[in-house]
Amino acid sequence: MKKIYDLWVRVSLIKKIGIGVVIGVMLGILAPDLTGFSILGKLFVGGLKAIAPLLVFALVSQAISHQKKGRQTNMTLIIVLYLFGTFASALVAVLTAYLFPLTLVLNTPVNTELSPPQGVAEVFQSLLLKLVDNPINALATANYIGVLSWAIIFGLALKAASQETKHLIKTAAEVTSQIVVWIINLAPIGIMSLVFTTISENGVGILSDYAFLILVLVGTMVFVALVVNPLIAVLITRQNPYPLVLRCLRESGLTAFFTRSSAANIPVNMQLCQKIGLSKDTYSVSIPLGATINMGGAAITINVLTLAAVHTFGIPIDFLTALLLSVVAAVSACGASGVAGGSLLLIPVACSLFGISNDLAMQVVGVGFIVGVIQDSCETALNSSTDVLFTAIAENAFWKRKKA
């Protein structure tokens, strides 16, 4: 037994997760009635979601309270990369929709419990109000905009605190980080359960009717991950980006794919940034911020499904309108974390540009929910892995400038 345990400890976490995925698929196909097994996945995701807000608050307040004057954090470049990356993803989605026009069968039931925002202004109003949310409520509800704003305020206030108080904050951050490590080490079991649940509940062939839509969505996201993002990285760093890109996809994107939660993946991303050797002053802020505004995957979903609806209804569209759609999708995607239902519920905002009624737009949303098992997984994997990628290339660019 000890030999098996020692062998398991020596195997890398990624290989363990791979083993968990294979076992989860086999159990989902061969023993789908083991419904009690799904609780392990819920516990794993719940644990990550529970600790993530506390981790963000502890690390950000600790980093700011200990920050010395003149220390570079590269946040300006990172935010520019987040916004540009989201717009680039939206533009690629428009071009993809032109190359591979989709026709939707809009006979899906509409979830009337969900109400989309009335426009981009409402999305950003919701986002701004989250800045001044009650700090306890922000932690309890995982409102990362609120958590970040209060963590920054607390960090600035703690600059004037005694060294003993600062040491206490640092210890709290270290303790929280250690708890995160323990939870992440349970990823193989949690992901095995999540895979089992997906296969046992949906089967392996339930999405065949929407195969082309899924192919276009996933293909666009893969293109952005393996072509567009590396191109951005090359322009910034002037070196081969693929070792870093593939590492981010492997160590961040893989867990995000199965948890389907950018919030749950924040601790995973922070641990990866630490392993890469990035500055804690930077990634403690950029990673939770990225989970909120870096939404390239969401922009792709909004544009592909909106243009599929436009094609279905035979609405003519010129290039300037498509460009405007890219801007609206990018802006809306940045506020996706502030909307119940995420990127799918922002589709009616984009559809309104073409005069598509809310009832019909909500049927498009219904199609999105059907393919959501795959769409949401790929979208989260792209969004979350890009947070680490852009943080890393911004820091790399800073050190290159400093050496020059």
UniProtKB/Swiss-Prot annotation:
Keyword Transport: yes
Keyword terms: Amino-acid transport, Cell membrane, Membrane, Symport, Transmembrane, Transmembrane helix, Transport
Record's keyword annotation contains Mitochondrion: no
Membrane-spanning residues: 17-37, 39-59, 75-95, 138-158, 179-199, 212-232, 287-307, 313-333
Membrane topology, from the record: Multi-pass membrane protein
Subcellular location: Cell membrane
Pfam family, one: SDF
Coiled-coil regions listed in the entry: none
A GO-annotated cellular component: plasma membrane
Catalytic reaction equation(s): L-serine(in) + Na(+)(in) = L-serine(out) + Na(+)(out); L-threonine(in) + Na(+)(in) = L-threonine(out) + Na(+)(out)
Molecular function (Gene Ontology), one example: amino acid transmembrane transporter activity
Gene Ontology biological process terms from the UniProt entry: serine transport; threonine transport
PANTHER family in the cross-refs: PROTON/GLUTAMATE-ASPARTATE SYMPORTER, PROTON_GLUTAMATE-ASPARTATE SYMPORTER
Function, as annotated: Involved in the import of serine and threonine into the cell, with the concomitant import of sodium (symport system).
Family: Belongs to the dicarboxylate/amino acid:cation symporter (DAACS) (TC 2.A.23) family.
Protein name: Serine/threonine transporter SstT
